[in-house]
């Protein structure tokens, strides 16, 4: 049968996407959407595209905290894909996320609404004094376990935290159980070329 005629706007959009692909632009930026952990996330060049390898990190945390109510902090949240995925799959969790970029945080907040989860987002430079005071509010913890996973030259950090008291992790008030970060990375050769 005869298909529907494309509007001028649709034709222009298709032409724009084809041209972007010809210039090796990521399809996710061209479409404005990336799939991650069974969910859709809006993406722009203000945030990195969620990578499939990052799903391994999310899966590990979900497995470790299934059925619990952990307090989780995601540092450098970007699109919010880690924080939002954790909040979606750990419904009892209290998830906070920080990023230095207001544009990234706006995108992350939109993604949280789109995926119908509650995450507390904060604009924060982790190298600033503000980060120290933010963490002092959650100071009654020590590192119980640190895990590093290396996949395709990417290093993920996942820190499990435990209170100094003998209370169970799930009942902690104002303390973190887990800090997760998947910061952007630049390979050493590329970093040298950027600096020079």
Regions found by a protein language model. Name each.
Residues 1-14:
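A short N-terminal interaction module
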Residues 2, 16-90, 95-110, 121-124, ...:
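SAM-dependent Rossmann-like transferase core, predominantly class I methyltransferases
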Residues 8-9, 63, 196:
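Polar/charged alpha-helical tracts
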Residues 92-94, 98-196:
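S-adenosylmethionine
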């Amino acid at each position: 049968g005869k298909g529907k005629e494309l509007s001028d706007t649709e034709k222009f959009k298709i032409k724009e996407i084809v041209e972007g692909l010809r210039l090796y632009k990521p399809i996710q930026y061209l479409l404005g959407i990336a799939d991650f952990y069974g969910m859709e996330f809006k993406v722009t060049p203000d945030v990195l595209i969620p990578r499939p390898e990052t799903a391994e990190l999310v899966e590990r945390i979900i497995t470790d905290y299934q059925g619990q109510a952990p307090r989780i902090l995601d540092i450098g949240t970007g699109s919010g894909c880690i924080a939002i995925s954790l909040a979606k799959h750990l419904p009892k969790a209290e998830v906070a996320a920080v990023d230095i970029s207001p544009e990234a945080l706006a995108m992350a907040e939109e993604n949280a609404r789109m995926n119908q989860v509650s995450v507390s987002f904060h604009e924060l430079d982790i190298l600033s004094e503000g980060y120290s005071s933010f963490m002092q509010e959650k100071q009654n913890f020590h590192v119980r376990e640190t895990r590093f996973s290396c996949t395709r030259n990417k290093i993920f950090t996942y820190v499990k935290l435990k209170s100094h008291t003998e209370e169970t992790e799930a009942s902690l008030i104002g303390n973190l159980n887990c800090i997760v970060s998947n910061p952007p990375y630049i390979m050493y050769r590329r970093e040298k070329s950027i600096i020079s």
